[in-house]
C-alpha cells in the first residue's frame, strides 16, 4: 500500500527534549530572580518543578494543558510570596513567555533537516505531540503541513481523538479519503506513539535508539508505566501492560536516519 502521509512525534524523536527543557527552566528561573526576587528568595526551581508535576498529575483541569500548568505554578508561588492576584497573574504570563520562547530553541538530531526535506517531496508531513513545542517556530517547521498538540486538541496520545484529528487534517489537505493504514506515525514512546497509532489503524515506526529516551517499554515487555500517556486516557497499569504486549510496531529503527529504509520496507 502506498504511504500518503507521515506524522512525527517531536520531543526525543526529531530533537532531544532534555537539554532544551533544562535550559528553558533555568533561564526562566533566572528571569524570576530579577523580576520576582520575593519568590526566588523563598522557593527553589526544584520546589516549583515538584509542585508543577503534582498539579499535572492530580488536577484533571490540566490533564492535557502543559502550558497552563506552568503558568498556574508560577502564579501559585507568586501568591505564596505575597504578590497580589494581579501581580501574580502578570508574572505568570511574562515568565511563561520567556520559557516558551526558549522552548522552541531546539537542536535537531543529525540528519533530520535533510530527511524531512526529502520526505516532503513525496509525502504530506505532519506532527502529533503531547508536548507544547510549536514546531512552526523551529528551523524545521516549514516541512510540515499541519501540527497537532495535546493542549490544542485537549487530547493526548495514545487517545484515539488526536490521531483521528490527524487523519481528518490529512484527508482535507490531500482532498481525498484515506485508509488509516496509508499513514505512518513515527515516535520514540511505545505507549504514546506506537500503541496510539496502531489503535487508530495507522502504520507505526518505533524509534528505539536514543540513550535519553524513556526505557519503559520493550517490544513485548512493559517495564515502567508512562504516567502522562496513561493519564491521558485513564489507562490502568494492567491495561497499559496488556496493550504493550499485544501491539507490535510495523518497524523499529535505531536512528531517525534509518527511517527511509523502514518506509521502503512498509511500501513493498
Label for each model-derived stretch:
Residues 2-110:
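N-terminal helical cap/lid subdomain that shapes the substrate entry/recognition surface
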Residues 1-6, 18, 34, 41, ...:
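Asp-based, Mg2+/Mn2+-dependent phosphohydrolase catalytic module
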